[in-house]
């Protein structure tokens, strides 16, 4: 769901945050697990370590040699699911309020609390 505060591009609402462990649920990298290294709110995408690798060819510049670079490309956030390292299982996310009154994210299948 996108929200727009009247100016600029729409910002998407995310179920994942930087540092979360996620599993890819569709596409060429289906089943791969990695950490979210960056969140791109205006594009609705995330960058996951070791997933959606692309090769970039760099031409020689002056005294530098040409080379090929491998880097992660963004992937839509709807194509990833939060992943429990303890149970080795992907799960949807839910929200609950703790006894201290703090709203936290919880994995629905395992009951694991994500926010500390």
Curated annotation (Swiss-Prot):
Keywords: Ribonucleoprotein, Ribosomal protein, RNA-binding, rRNA-binding. GO terms for biological process: translation. Residues 1-21 are annotated as: Disordered. One of its GO terms (molecular function) is rRNA binding. InterPro entries: KOW (IPR005824), Rib_uL2_dom2 (IPR014722), Ribosomal_uL24 (IPR003256), Ribosomal_uL24_CS (IPR005825), Ribosomal_uL24_KOW (IPR041988), Translation_prot_SH3-like_sf (IPR008991). GO terms for cellular component: cytosolic large ribosomal subunit. It comes from the Bacteria. PROSITE patterns: RIBOSOMAL_L24. Part of the 50S ribosomal subunit. NCBIfam families: rplX_bact (TIGR01079). Belongs to the universal ribosomal protein uL24 family. One of two assembly initiator proteins, it binds directly to the 5'-end of the 23S rRNA, where it nucleates assembly of the 50S subunit. One of the proteins that surrounds the polypeptide exit tunnel on the outside of the subunit. This is Large ribosomal subunit protein uL24. It comes from Gloeobacter violaceus (strain ATCC 29082 / PCC 7421).
């Amino acid at each position: 769901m996108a929200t727009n505060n009247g100016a600029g591009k729409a910002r998407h609402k995310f179920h994942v945050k930087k540092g979360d462990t996620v599993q890819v649920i569709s596409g060429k990298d289906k089943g791969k697990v990695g950490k979210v290294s960056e969140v791109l709110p205006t594009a609705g995408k995330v960058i996951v370590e070791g997933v959606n690798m692309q090769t970039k060819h760099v031409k020689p510049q002056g005294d530098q040699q040409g080379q090929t670079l491998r880097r992660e490309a963004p992937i839509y956030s709807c194509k990833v699911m939060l992943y429990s390292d303890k149970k080795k299982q992907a799960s949807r996310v839910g929200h609950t309020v703790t006894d201290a009154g703090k709203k936290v994210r919880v994995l629905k299948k395992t009951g694991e609390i994500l926010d500390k």
